[in-house]
Amino acid sequence: MSTSSSAVSQLKNSPLAGNINYEPTVWSRADALKVNENDPTTTQPLVSADFPVMSDTVFIWDTMPLRELDGTVVSVNGWSVILTLTADRHPDDPQYLDANGRYDIKRDWEDRHGRARMCYWYSRTGKDWIFGGRVMAEGVSPTTREWAGTPILLNDKGDIDLYYTCVTPGAAVAKVRGRIVTSDQGVELKDFTQVKKLFEADGTYYQTEAQNSSWNFRDPSPFIDPNDGKLYMVFEGNVAGERGSHTVGAAELGPVPPGHEDVGGARFQVGCIGLAVAKDLSGEEWEILPPLVTAVGVNDQTERPHYVFQDGKYYLFTISHKFTYADGITGPDGVYGFVGEHLFGPYRPMNASGLVLGNPPEQPFQTYSHCVMPNGLVTSFIDSVPTEGEDYRIGGTEAPTVRILLKGDRSFVQEEYDYGYIPAMKDVQLS
């Protein structure tokens, strides 16, 4: 891990954040070569193929617990709340029937991203989730897809800011404000009617659609820096520049061993964890800052970045795929992490490689879209689990929760809990 200004120029002065002088931390190929998919301390337990499904009518994937700006997962009047990316299942739709008239769940599942909607669920137990419905009515969001973000409980009046991604056409970080109403019977999320687009990729720090038609720009996660008290946001991006124009230089290589100097087509993998700062705690105006971590020549996706603040350290987590790694290096689908003592870095890859929690090699696609909470619990969804022969079972439901122990720059897998167990760390009673 090193810092370099070769991929992204550093920022000298920010109108909103003040005098900032930092360079992105480079996740190098040498770091990634240390990834060990068979390390039991960073491997998620096997998910059984007889897993329960939380809904027969919808698929769910990215899960977003309701939280406060310091990361605390909250319940409201005793009700836990999660948001999920959601799409209807189509078992009777002729479009998803095979030649024998059987439901092709695999194709239905693979098509879900184009019809993703933000929905909510509630529970008294932190599991046994009850479906509440859509957060925004049809037509409220200005694009065809509602992709992942973060719901923030603002106060004890029940106001919620949902930061999310407006996708197709384009991709923009957006915010919509509503409120939560509870009763003895359940929960309603109401009045999420006015979406405000906050910013898009700028082409200077973050790659735009014009620079790369398969660019990544999504997954806002706002937080208050425990040191300076300002409101920031991390998000997924790609390092700016025309596709194929990036250089995998000495910093991006790192101290690789002999025989690993050839990077093939690694210049096409240009993932990064982006940063923005708000004008004030209202979160209405934002300024884009340079990336915190770049993965040029390593990986093209650093999805759903988010923080855990513990023991004076900044634990910055992200998720990524095996298929988005660059030529010559590999790693499992799962959680990757970086740790430092300051928001602006420098950061070090956790466990030397960056890998925190990966799928087991025998079930490489069992779970994804992990969210690490401040209590060490990690939630994810089930993608597909092998059954007999070459067959497998599609999930689209919550995976078993696991706990990880954070110890300095290292992490260790600990207990496994029930499917979709996302307990509140604090209950907020509405006034």
From Swiss-Prot:
It comes from Pseudomonas savastanoi pv. glycinea. It catalyses: [6)-beta-D-fructofuranosyl-(2->](n) alpha-D-glucopyranoside + sucrose = [6)-beta-D-fructofuranosyl-(2->](n+1) alpha-D-glucopyranoside + D-glucose. Its main location: periplasm. CDD domains: GH68. GO terms for biological process: carbohydrate utilization. The record marks D219 as: Transition state stabilizer. The active site is at D62, E303. Keywords: Carbohydrate metabolism, Glycosyltransferase, Periplasm, Transferase. SUPFAM superfamilies: Arabinanase/levansucrase/invertase (SSF75005). This is Levansucrase LscC. Induction: The upstream region of the gene contains a phage-associated promoter element (PAPE), which also includes the first 48 nucleotides of lscC and is essential for expression of the gene. Even though the upstream region of the gene is sufficient to promote expression, the expression level is enhanced by the presence of the 48-bp N-terminus of lscC. Expression is induced by the transcriptional regulator LscR, which is able to bind specifically to lsc upstream PAPE sequence. Transcription is temperature-dependent. It comes from the Bacteria. Disruption phenotype: Disruption mutant does not exhibit a levan-deficient phenotype. The lscB-lscC double mutant is completely defective in levan formation and can be complemented by either lscB or lscC. The keyword Transferase applies. Sucrose binds at W61, D62, A148, R218, D219. GO terms for cellular component: periplasmic space. It is found in: Periplasm. Catalyzes the synthesis of levan, a fructose polymer, by transferring the fructosyl moiety from sucrose to a growing acceptor molecule. Its EC number is 2.4.1.10. It is an enzyme of class 2 (transferase). Belongs to the glycosyl hydrolase 68 family. The lineage of its organism: Bacteria, Pseudomonadati, Pseudomonadota, Gammaproteobacteria, Pseudomonadales.
